[in-house]
Amino acid sequence: MTLADKPVLSHAVKKLLTNQYIDYVRVIINRNHEDFYRETIDSLHNYYLSEAVHSFQYVTLKSRKKEEWIPVSSTGMKGRVDTKLLSPVYGGKSRQNSVKLGLESLQKINPDFVVIHDACRPFVSNTLINNLARSMINNQHTGVVPAIEVEDTISLVNDDLIESTIPRERLRAIQTPQIFNFKELLSYHRSNKEFTDDSSLMVEHKKRVVVTRGEKINFKLTTKEDINMAKLLLDEPKYRVGTGYDIHRFIKAQGKAKSFIKICGVEIEYDMKIEAHSDGDVAIHAVVDAILGALGCGDIGAHFPPSFPEWKDRNSSHFLDFAAKKAKEKGYSVSNLDITIVCEEPKISPYKVAMKKFISKTLEIDSEFVNVKATTTEKLGSIGRNEGILAHASVLLYKIAPLHN
């Protein structure tokens, strides 16, 4: 299962890998899922991990004094995957057995504290992790767990009939991540008693487990309703907005032959030429930048550097095709596009219909969703002196099914 096109597990693991108090992360996986785990590690950026059947992972913290609350790395997690992300460990037949196997695997590291988190809680926040870690490090508790107050009425039900109502003032819903003294938790797991979570195991052995405030957003994906709620919260936005801008200088045309400039893919006869590395279509360049900006994919210069000879005199429709393909690959299509062309000459109005037709055909959208406007600067500035031409573009993209090869 994925959220925002990424495995559920990846969201929680990323938070743990980037947290300042976490020294190591180890994921417990089903032995039949190792290939999927490895493939995901190799293929995804930012060290996202693939989903595992046993939906939890371990992180360890070394003891730190109060004045030593400093990040593990000031550069973040990038480049540290080999040292911070440990190799996965196979789980057992039950959650508790998998926890025990994970704890056993950490003996060589011998951390002071261990954090156990359900990966099916993708909304764990750095604030929550930090609060738990500080409480544990500062007070040397045996265990610290997050919990939220129970706000609904709680009743005992038998055969769909309410038998009694339970006072809720002292009731709490326990969440993860949960932090414990590593050696004590491991020793109690070796007793092989069955418990629903690790805090229950510690309490059974008369150990004090401190409760701190949890977060409602840190809910567990258990039912279909939970999953639908998570998708609403975490899936990519349905719409994206981008803007683009481009400007080019006019230069004198050489010779007596007719000269043309190209705007929105349409040739316009004019006694000047556009100085540019490509064909100088300012409007298309602005549109390309708007689409790339909406996608978070940089700008036209990053993909088609003017220093590269292969783009010399290149038809700008090639750049527009590229941007449209990028949008499809990321699962977006153009909802509507607004272009403003600013110049004193030539006159744009006679060509607007042809411009709309060219742009809409290239982007594979109806021409009614493309608007082309033209204006002047009332003789002000370099454009007013007819030294060049510029264009602005605004685009709205909407989410469609992503393109899979």
Swiss-Prot record:
Annotated binding of 4-CDP-2-C-methyl-D-erythritol 2-phosphate, by residue: D246, I247, H248, H277, S278, D299, I300, G301, T375, T376, T377, E378, R385
Cofactor dependency: a divalent metal cation
Residues flagged as site, Transition state stabilizer: H277, T376
SUPFAM superfamilies, A to Z: IpsF-like, Nucleotide-diphospho-sugar transferases
Gene3D superfamilies reported for this sequence: 2-C-methyl-D-erythritol 2,4-cyclodiphosphate synthase, Spore Coat Polysaccharide Biosynthesis Protein SpsA, Chain A
Chain intervals for the UniProt region annotation (2-C-methyl-D-erythritol 4-phosphate cytidylyltransferase): 1-240
Residues annotated as site: Positions MEP for the nucleophilic attack: R168, K220
Keyword field contains Aminoacyl-tRNA synthetase: no
InterPro entries reported for this sequence: IspD/F, IspD/TarI, MECDP_synthase, MECDP_synthase_CS, MECDP_synthase_sf, Nucleotide-diphossugar_trans
UniProt-listed PROSITE patterns: ISPF
Region (2-C-methyl-D-erythritol 2,4-cyclodiphosphate synthase): 240-405
UniProt pathway: Isoprenoid biosynthesis; isopentenyl diphosphate biosynthesis via DXP pathway; isopentenyl diphosphate from 1-deoxy-D-xylulose 5-phosphate: step 2/6; Isoprenoid biosynthesis; isopentenyl diphosphate biosynthesis via DXP pathway; isopentenyl diphosphate from 1-deoxy-D-xylulose 5-phosphate: step 4/6
Keywords tagged on the record: Isoprene biosynthesis, Lyase, Metal-binding, Multifunctional enzyme, Nucleotidyltransferase, Transferase
Catalytic reaction list: 2-C-methyl-D-erythritol 4-phosphate + CTP + H(+) = 4-CDP-2-C-methyl-D-erythritol + diphosphate; 4-CDP-2-C-methyl-D-erythritol 2-phosphate = 2-C-methyl-D-erythritol 2,4-cyclic diphosphate + CMP
Role of this protein: Bifunctional enzyme that catalyzes the formation of 4-diphosphocytidyl-2-C-methyl-D-erythritol from CTP and 2-C-methyl-D-erythritol 4-phosphate (MEP) (IspD), and catalyzes the conversion of 4-diphosphocytidyl-2-C-methyl-D-erythritol 2-phosphate (CDP-ME2P) to 2-C-methyl-D-erythritol 2,4-cyclodiphosphate (ME-CPP) with a corresponding release of cytidine 5-monophosphate (CMP) (IspF).
Assigned protein family: In the N-terminal section; belongs to the IspD/TarI cytidylyltransferase family. IspD subfamily. In the C-terminal section; belongs to the IspF family.
HAMAP family assigned: IspDF, IspF
Protein name: Bifunctional enzyme IspD/IspF
Native species: Wolbachia sp. subsp. Brugia malayi (strain TRS)
